[in-house]
């Protein structure tokens, strides 16, 4: 499976490393010039990052027996200053000649990324390269660690690389995390965002969704065979982590690790059109008007209760498809394409177990999010802090279970 993926779907850097030819000119680093075998690989994309921050991060991994694949990149349409700063970063990183880092240049002229593919392509380049090195025997572990330049790695971060999965389809693992900042307002914004995301994931879990997990690229580890099976990272300028895990969930487990927790610097960023950076910007703007944070809104709990009803209705349909869905739920699921899905499946000979799997593959993480957002038309958003303070005990316990903010 891995060989087939690398041959047919991998990016050029990985195919070159896996072949008999010399490494392409945009790859550099001492590990390319020796034969050391590492415990595992860690992939970090970097665009318009400060050298000091990245140097500190890379240095912290020096004794971990981890080969870091650093993909220094810039989209073709980035502003000239960001491109110039990223190229200067590339120059400074090259000067260090780290013994444990391979640098991929996707920031120089002729090498920059398609803006529509952005960070998704950057992650894919790095992970494809890690996969090729694993196949070539340069790494022992099947786990591919992924992170970002704003993460502080705790002691024990690389311990996962020493574990042996029970099955080849081991899926993905999610590290717990919390956002922090030396700026009090930004720190509080990071806390609110972590609470919002933990509340959302807990709501999915309460509803019985199998897509109840965080989707943050800097906190993911993917098993090599699983990564190949889903054909790697989607080439997207944002949301690549969400879509990768959405694909993995249909094939293998996505599990949250008990620890260690990653500390992620809360940063207002315009690198991507949506995600953590833009969300933090909106929260900071909100805090300027209401420093208490009470006016920061999140989903109404009844959205998740309605999701639970929908999932139970789909389970009943899988057992007895001759009994059609009815009422408001049918309308909401039809708006997501359920009628076409059910009609297509009805033309096949299927068992209840097969229908159950198919319907939950169809009603995936993306459709779940779309369903929750559609519920906002009847259950308006409300204060996150007030919601968390007034949740029933079981729901509050579940939020605590998924809580990423350690204070």
Predicted feature residues:
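N-proximal low-complexity "stem/linker" segments adjacent to membrane-targeting elements
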Residues: 1-63
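Catalytic donor-sugar/metal-binding loop of nucleotide-sugar-dependent glycosyltransferases
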Residues: 236, 248-263
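Acidic donor-binding/catalytic loop of UDP-sugar-dependent glycosyltransferases
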Residues: 52, 138-142, 146-163
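A recurrent flexible, glycine/aromatic-enriched loop bordering the glycosyltransferase active site
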Residues: 201-221
């Amino acid at each position: 499976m891995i060989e087939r993926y690398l041959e047919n779907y991998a990016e050029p850097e990985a195919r070159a490393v896996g072949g008999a030819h010399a490494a392409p000119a945009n790859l550099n680093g001492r590990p390319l010039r020796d034969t050391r075998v590492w415990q595992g690989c860690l992939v970090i994309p970097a665009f318009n990052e400060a050298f000091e921050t990245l140097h500190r991060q890379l240095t912290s991994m020096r004794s971990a027996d981890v080969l870091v694949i650093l993909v220094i990149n810039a989209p073709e349409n980035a502003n000239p200053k960001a491109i110039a700063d990223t190229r200067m970063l590339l120059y400074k990183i090259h000067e260090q000649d780290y013994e444990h880092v391979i640098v991929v240049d996707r920031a120089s002229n002729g090498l920059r990324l398609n803006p529509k593919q952005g960070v998704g392509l950057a992650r894919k380049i790095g992970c494809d390269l890690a996969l090729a090195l694993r196949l070539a025997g340069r790494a022992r572990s099947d786990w591919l660690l992924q992170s970002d330049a704003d993460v502080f790695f705790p002691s024990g971060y690389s311990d996962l690389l020493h574990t042996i999965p029970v099955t080849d389809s081991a899926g993905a693992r999610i590290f717990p995390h919390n956002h922090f900042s030396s700026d009090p307002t930004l720190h509080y914004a990071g806390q609110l965002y972590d609470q919002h995301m933990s509340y959302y994931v807990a709501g999915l879990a309460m509803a019985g969704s199998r897509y109840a997990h965080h989707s943050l690229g800097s906190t993911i580890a993917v098993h090599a065979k699983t990564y190949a099976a889903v054909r790697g990272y989607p080439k997207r300028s944002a949301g690549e982590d969400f879509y990768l895990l959405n694909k993995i969930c249909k094939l293998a487990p996505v599990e949250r690790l008990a620890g260690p927790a990653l500390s992620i610097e809360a940063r207002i960023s315009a690198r991507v059109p949506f995600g953590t950076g833009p969300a933090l910007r909106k929260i900071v703007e909100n805090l300027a008007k209401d420093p208490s944070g009470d006016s920061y809104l999140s989903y109404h709990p009844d959205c998740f209760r309605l999701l639970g009803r929908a999932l139970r209705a789909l389970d009943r349909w899988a057992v007895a498809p001759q009994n059609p869905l009815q009422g408001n739920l049918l309308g909401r699921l039809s708006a997501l394409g359920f009628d076409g899905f059910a009609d297509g499946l009805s033309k096949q000979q299927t068992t209840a177990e097969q229908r159950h799997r198919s319907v939950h593959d169809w009603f995936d993480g993306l459709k779940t999010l779309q369903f929750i957002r559609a519920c906002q038309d009847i259950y308006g958003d409300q204060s996150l802090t007030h919601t968390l303070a007034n949740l029933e005990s079981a729901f509050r316990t579940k939020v605590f279970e998924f809580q990423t903010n350690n204070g």
